[in-house]
Design a protein with these regions (language model features):
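Short acidic/polar hinge/loop motifs at secondary-structure boundaries
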Residues: 109-139
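Short, acidic, small-residue-rich periplasmic hinge/interaction motif at the N-terminus
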Residues: 20-61, 97
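Outer membrane beta-barrel strand-and-loop segments of large Gram-negative receptors
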Residues: 359, 363-369, 418-422, 519-525, ...
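Structural signature of Gram-negative outer-membrane beta-barrels, strongest in the C-terminal barrel
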Residues: 267-269, 384, 411-555, 612-617, ...
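Gram-negative outer-membrane beta-barrel transporters
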Residues: 433-434, 439, 448, 551-554, ...
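N-terminal periplasmic accessory domains that precede
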Residues: 68-71, 88-91, 103, 120-123, ...
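Transmembrane beta-barrel wall of Gram-negative outer-membrane proteins
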Residues: 183-209, 220-285, 311-313, 430-433, ...
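Flexible loop and strand-edge segments within Gram-negative outer membrane beta-barrel domains
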Residues: 21, 251-257, 267, 271-328, ...
Length: 736
């Protein structure tokens, strides 16, 4: 209670000592805003037919979240699933993981081993280094290519600041330290900017140490669920089941993370620039919390289950011209290389053998774009190329003797390669003489190829040495926007999307759940979506923006994991036990529909109200019998709150809420993780959250906040770990 009063007092004192002038950076209505994600080039938001949510730098700092996954969830922009604390898998319009595209500074993060279940790669994006983020809803394949079925989350990192006219050098920076009580979080961030007239650089480094996550203790809308009553540990050379002295602490969920950004920009003249962009993220081992709670014959199934350090390296060079001949909107070319290292390690309770499976992915990319503008029209065109090289290794170690023995790899042991090359063009135009109407079109076409080789057949006698695919791809979009003088906006958008099978889809061998194993199927083909949006928005005097969007998506040739026969058998011996054979197959048609409503209102110069609501429904279409529920469909969720702000102080309070998900609306044996939910399904939940900040002087600011004010015990749908309980946060920021 003392902590509660202290944090509340800090938040309220910010209001008491604030100055009268208005801080416009924290306004919620931004009428003249431009967005980049929809067409990969800057465009007025009012002219974009596709639904877009923008998270600006001031809002990112105000939310003050621990990871990029938490940023997306706390903002209410998307639903986020978690299997462990070091994770976060965004869901956009009923699509998740490899069906949602992640983009950083215009470069695809998705690679050839992004899986269709749940992912945690988003946490390798340092949210403390972000300038903004844009969430694009609905298929975005025309602009970005494969994987953007449900949409795209586009991150834009901070850019260095140049010296102004008359200055020889401009330097500055900022640093902060944050503490959070629910997981004993300790995060430190430092950022330095040095800029001259022609060269400028920014360096940012973040270190985070997260302890075991404490869940809430108040049951909210349902019975208590998810307590960690027992855990496995090794004592005296033997696996032992121990009683957790505090069952609200989710034992073995903590981890550490390190993030680095270095960006250097050289401007030889006013028309051209060269940018070197280097990003590196790594972590400690990350415990797979949900698997560590799986029951087994001796109490728990696993003694160890963790991801090894998750490493992401990005090195990119970008050349840009403001104008180049006919292309008066400029040209840009980005050459990039990414290296991703992932591993997973598991050992069953009482078994001295631990399995190690390691993956390395190298990704080379080239993106070129050119823009042309006329009086009432604009056009953007470009070329995309990516090449993925996947190497997979595995072994089994006896932790008692140190003996190393062979083990089957997660992906083809002979390596896998995947390429895609495509050209795209987008065009928009305003009707001359009636500029209330804006029309847009887009088209992408190209080819993708994949090859995976199976060398060692010790564990699986595959009837083939390699699997190959070569596929033509295409997508298109068509939009119309009407902006009336009275403040009404009508947007119509039709688009298609695609996702080509990657190495994970085609060549993976692993256990999706105990007692089953997924084997390769070289005959799968791309997934496709066809989408239609209707958006109605009311804008009033730059004080109110109320957006409502209805949408429907037809999902065709969906890749699903289903029963399969391998060498004529429906079961094989895998990891020491007979397992049901499954494989990815194009066996599903589905329909997904829903709506969203977003309200932003600057009620007074210093007071804003906001709210968002998202509803999604998905059904698998059956040729015979009743339709089935589609997995990855979240319950209704949303966010509602207020923000009071001045140049020195701000206070923000909001509710995050999720509806319930009945167990009958889960897809049996799908990706909804019904085994980690109560018997009747996932209960509804709501958390109250409060943030406050006060700037004492130009160089010093204090932020304080309380997440989950009422210490509600809850678990997000499809997740394998409970959400954090009451979390006191305090952050000290220094700028120079």
């Amino acid at each position: 209670m003392k902590h509660l009063l202290l944090i509340f007092g800090v938040c309220m004192s910010a209001a008491a000592f604030a100055q009268a002038p208005v801080d416009t950076t924290l306004k919620v209505v931004h009428i003249g805003e431009t967005v980049v994600s929809a067409t990969r080039s800057s465009q007025a938001r009012t002219a974009v037919a596709q639904q877009v949510t923008v998270l600006r730098q001031a809002e990112i700092e105000q939310l003050n979240t621990s990871t990029a996954a938490d940023l997306i969830q706390q903002s209410g922009a998307a639903f986020v699933q978690k299997s462990q604390q070091g994770g976060g898998s965004p869901v956009l319009r009923g699509f998740e993981a490899s069906r949602v595209l992640l983009v950083v500074d215009g470069i695809r993060m998705n690679n050839a081993i992004y899986r269709a279940g749940h992912l945690q790669n988003i946490i390798t994006m340092d949210n403390a280094a972000l300038e903004r983020a844009e969430i694009l809803y609905g298929p975005a394949s025309t602009a970005y290519g494969s994987d953007a079925l449900g949409g795209a989350i586009c991150f834009y990192t901070k850019n260095p600041v140049f010296a102004e006219a008359g200055e020889s050098l401009r330097s500055g920076g900022n640093a902060f330290f944050r503490y959070g009580s629910a997981n004993e979080e300790k995060t430190a961030h430092v950022e330095v900017n040095v800029g001259g007239q022609r060269v400028a650089s920014i360096t940012a480094y973040t270190f985070s140490d997260f302890g075991d996550l404490r869940m809430g203790e108040n049951n909210g809308f349902a019975a208590f669920f998810g307590k960690r009553r027992f855990y496995a540990d090794r004592i005296g050379g033997r696996d032992t089941i121990l009683r957790n002295p505090d069952p609200y602490v989710q034992k073995f969920s903590g981890y550490r993370q390190y993030d680095l950004l270095e960006k250097v920009v050289f401007r030889p003249n006013a028309n051209s620039s060269h940018t070197l962009n280097v990003q590196y993220s790594t972590s400690s081992d990350i415990p797979r919390y949900d698997r560590l709670t799986d029951p087994g014959p001796q109490g728990l199934r696993y003694s160890e289950w963790y991801y090894g350090p998750q490493q992401r390296l990005l090195a990119a060079y970008k050349f840009a011209l403001q104008e180049w001949g006919w292309f008066n909107g400029g040209v840009r070319a980005t050459l990039s290389y990414q290296n991703i290292e992932e591993s997973r390690h598991d050992r069953r309770f009482g078994n001295p053998q631990i399995n190690h499976r390691m993956e390395n992915v190298g990704v080379w990319g080239l993106e070129t774009e050119a823009e042309k503008h006329w009086e009432h029209q604009s056009m953007s065109m470009g070329l995309d190329f990516q090449y993925n090289d996947v190497q997979s290794e595995a072994n089994r170690e006896n932790i008692e003797t140190g003996v190393i023995s062979p083990q089957n790899t997660r992906y083809p042991d002979g390596g896998g390669q995947m390429y895609n090359i495509a050209v795209f063009a987008t065009h928009s135009w305003q009707v001359p003489g009636n500029e209330q109407w804006t029309f847009s079109e887009g088209l992408r076409g190209g080819f993708t190829g994949l090859k995976a080789r199976f060398d060692d057949k010790m564990f699986f006698p595959f009837p083939y040495d390699e699997a190959t695919q070569n596929t033509a791809i295409w997508s298109a979009s068509l939009g119309a926007v009407w902006n009336s003088p009275e403040g009404w906006r009508l947007a119509l958008n039709a688009s298609s999307g695609f996702r080509v099978p990657n190495i994970d889809d085609l060549g993976k061998v692993f256990d999706s759940q105990p007692g089953s194993v997924i084997v390769p199927n070289p005959d799968i083909k791309p997934e496709k979506t066809y989408n239609f949006d209707l958006g109605i928005t009311r804008v009033s005097a730059e004080r109110l923006r109320w957006e409502n969007v209805l949408w429907v998506t037809a999902f065709r040739d969906a890749i699903v994991t289903d029963v399969f026969r391998f060498n004529g058998q429906d079961s094989v011996l895998y990891d020491g036990e007979m397992s049901l054979v499954l494989a990815n197959q194009n066996k599903r048609r589905a329909r997904i529909w829903g709506f969203s409503s977003n309200l932003e209102a600057d009620v007074y110069d210093d007071l804003a109200l906001f709210g968002s609501l998202h509803y999604t429904r998905g059904r698998i279409l059956q040729d015979e019998g009743d339709d089935l529920p589609l997995d990855h469909i979240p319950p209704m969720y949303g966010r509602v709150g207020f923000r009071w702000h001045t140049p020195r102080a701000s206070v923000e309070g909001f509710l995050l809420f999720n509806g319930s998900k009945d167990i009958n609306d889960y897809l049996p044996n799908g990706e909804d993780n019904e085994q980690y939910a109560p018997s009747g399904g996932m209960p509804a939940w709501m958390t109250a959250n409060l943030n406050g900040s006060y700037r004492f002087r130009r160089v010093l600011a204090l932020q304080a906040g309380i997440d989950n004010l009422f210490d509600t015990q809850y678990r997000v749908f499809s997740s394998g770990i409970n959400g954090p309980g009451r979390n006191f946060r305090i952050t000290l920021r220094v700028r120079w």
